[in-house]
């Protein structure tokens, strides 16, 4: 049965001959129960400040606004910006590509929460930007299920990579629930997963870029050993020194090293 909000959505599409943009990764959430479940996961209080990335037709926006008026949305598609302006007169809308959005300056004196159904093609880039620059307390994001599986992958598995390690070291991550592709229009080819994450308080984020760079070196070629990957960037003597200190066998492959050990190695290689 089609609800009131779905009817409004379909009417707008027909009236405006709206076509979802593949380039922008537009798949709009239309399941009312899932919308509520996502927003409830963020545990919004009336005085909370919230940033929503890619609101689309306002699937989550309306529910968030019922819980706090301190909502800012970032939307690139001008067609959707016009729709949101008509629907939510007092909503603060920033019409910009989220990859160009200045997370560092936004609400820099007040922590805020982040909510989003992320575009699949750029979700990892957005997550990196959030972790690097955003002054956020908690984030609830919907990502491609495959990405969620990578984020939560166990050491020694094929999906365990530099992205996995970086997020594990810098943030507390929870896999909340899966979302069927039937909950979207147009229907994507894959299912999604909602995750929650927040920054770890014991990690010094001034070291984020060095850690990110180091992990890229370690996983530059997953089929090669950790030693062979690092020898292109560090002197052999330094590598042997660090490996001996942490009892690392040179023939170990990158996916077989725990995240805690990567952090220790990073500190030693860069003398942090």
From Swiss-Prot:
Pfam families, per this entry? RrnaAD
Family annotation (SUPFAM superfamilies):
S-adenosyl-L-methionine-dependent methyltransferases (SSF53335)
Q: Which domain of life is it from?
A: Bacteria
Locate the residues binding S-adenosyl-L-methionine: 27, 29, 54, 75, 97, 117
Annotated source species: Malacoplasma penetrans (strain HF-2)
Q: Which HAMAP family match?
A: 16SrRNA_methyltr_A
What is the name of the protein in this document? Ribosomal RNA small subunit methyltransferase A
Q: Where in the cell is it found?
A: Cytoplasm
